[in-house]
């Protein structure tokens, strides 16, 4: 089985070898601070959140091929114990991102040219780690480069905002505070480089259901705590706060089980759910502690990975 997987990876690598192909990385993130406030007139929730990028990342390989009739041809492969993506490729946010940017740039895909994309998934879905949004941000950058456009073109950020607030963050990366519906950059913070463990129980959480449950039972963050989080200039100074945690833990009790277990482990400084879940992150005092916690979590049957905070963002790495 491993030999078959290696052969498949070799075939994929060869397809994207040579000039005209791009390789991009799409990092994960965690929310150090997430304060969901009231519902606006347009139906969206007002939020204030501090996001921090991580070294853990997906990889996108992209190139333009002669038109096949398809606007975008997307294939995916999951790594590190993740299940294959259970979504039609045409419904993937990567495809949506490319189509929206093509429209913004006035390009027609399908007949004369097709965007070929291969996505290597290492960030779990329904985890609150921003994997899909990061993939979309990377796809926007890759498409712009392949079409000969500047990655600083304002239309990229405009399309990112249409796709979702987290997509905007991954174009910026590092650590930053956002408000509005999560798309308005308030300030950047100095990133940290601490080690952390990501642990995800079985199942996920519907973000919509989590918001609904939070609306039924609001969990306001005190003005004092909100001020401490929103005035911080350094990532390490941000208090870990997430008022969606209770709602998501009720929807998926496994999140609470993971969080409470992490909080009891030696070397763990603090642990909290990221975003609307279902992943929980634990900041650790050393790599050795983080590695031990990850190993023990995997022994319990949970998906777990050690990684680091850092100044990462969706980025073109090399022509491959």
Enumerate the language-model features and the residues they cover.
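Contiguous, small/hydrophobic- and glycine-enriched helical/loop subdomains that border
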Residues: 113, 136, 140-177
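Conserved, helical-rich catalytic subdomain that frames metal- and/or nucleotide-binding sites
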Residues: 170-270, 285-291, 295, 306-320
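Glycine/serine-rich anion-binding loops at beta->alpha junctions
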Residues: 116-147, 165, 270-284
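Short, basic/glycine-rich phosphate-binding loops at helix/coil junctions
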Residues: 69-85, 139, 161, 232-241, ...
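ATP-binding N-lobe of GHMP and related small-molecule kinases
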Residues: 2-127, 145, 149-153, 183, ...
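Solvent-exposed alpha-helices and their adjacent loops that cap or buttress functional pockets
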Residues: 16, 53, 161-162, 168-171, ...
